[in-house]
Amino acid sequence: MSHQTGIKANAELLKFFGKCKDGKTRVLKVSIENEELALVDHKAVKKDWEKDYDALVKPLVEDDVPCYILYRLDYKIPTGYAWLLLSWVPEAATVRQKMLYASTKATLKLEFGSSNIKEEINATTKEETTLKGYQKHKIDFSAPAPLTSREEELAEIRKSEVKTDFGIDTKQQTLGGINCPISDPTSQALIDMRRGAYNYLQFRIDLEEEKIHVVNAANIDILKLPSQIPKDHARYHLYLFKHQHEGNHLDSVVFVYSMPGYTCSIRERMMYSSCKGPFSATIEKHGIEITKKIEIDNGEELTEEFIYEELHPRKLNLRPQFSKPKGPPSRGAKRLTKPQAVE
């Protein structure tokens, strides 16, 4: 996500990430401040993790202010103590805040050390940030032992094969496609676009969690659209193209899949190719009718003329020219007949 938001941990936070794994720190709070991840507060271990939980976490959770909370559990893994990542993004948060925190979480995990984070909670209500909320989350989302990356890929392929429906709605499934889940901010951005708040959305697949996130929601002039296309990573885009055609005003939603060739990894190319069908179906389930799907490898292609031609291809007038048919062949000189006299 750092490719889009540019938000990374500041020097103080990076230094504390190294220090907090000594076993003495129980919890730390991280927020996005001045376009960087910053350490807001931290508390030392006092009792066991269950007794410390509500006493230390509750004071860190503010009503309408999103944050990340990293909480040290008491069991160990090969790299040290296991940690819980609590992402607190309340419903009252703005769409921009939701997008920022969803888009920056992968960077936070990477800089803290993904292998140390063994559990995650995405909380939108204060009840979900309590010990009871954590215990309920464990019950609701209890799962088998973690799979390797290869096992996860195979499981996704099998799941997509099982879910393929050969009935009337087969066209919505895309045979062999992977149905990546979408984040809450992504769903909200689609709803907002349907209501007319934006004319452009850009989406990214988080390859680590295999989830689709919105990374840009804006009103973009058609002339500035090519500059929105990344040159080093694949993306999905939605653009509301308003134009005139044959005297009629049309509002056409164009789904664009941009893939800048071999600058992307094989896994990235495979994921974007596999997810585009199910994702476009998800978009339409949000009430947005896609008029045209376009694939490009260069943002410079995405001009007003190009989109117009894709929506309204020119019909070539190739009527065959028929020559005048020839008359019957000559049968010799015409005979003159005298009219007979009337008696």
UniProtKB/Swiss-Prot annotation:
UniProt entry tagged with the keyword Cytoplasm: yes
Keywords, in A-Z order: Actin-binding, Cytoplasm, Cytoskeleton, Repeat
Protein localization: Cytoplasm, Cytoskeleton; Cytoplasm, Cell cortex
Record-level Gene Ontology MF annotations: actin filament binding; actin monomer binding
SMART domains (UniProt xref): ADF (SM00102)
Pfam families: Cofilin_ADF
One GO cellular component term noted in the UniProt record for this chain: actin filament
Region described as Disordered: spans on this chain: 317-343
Protein's UniProt keywords contain Nucleotide-binding: no
Domain ADF-H: 4-139, 177-312
Biological-process GO terms, alphabetical: actin filament depolymerization; barbed-end actin filament capping; positive regulation of neuron projection development; regulation of lamellipodium assembly
Domain of life: Eukaryota
Subunit structure: Interacts with G-actin; ADP-actin form.
Family the UniProt entry places it in: Belongs to the actin-binding proteins ADF family. Twinfilin subfamily.
Protein function: Actin-binding protein involved in motile and morphological processes. Inhibits actin polymerization, likely by sequestering G-actin.
Protein name: Twinfilin
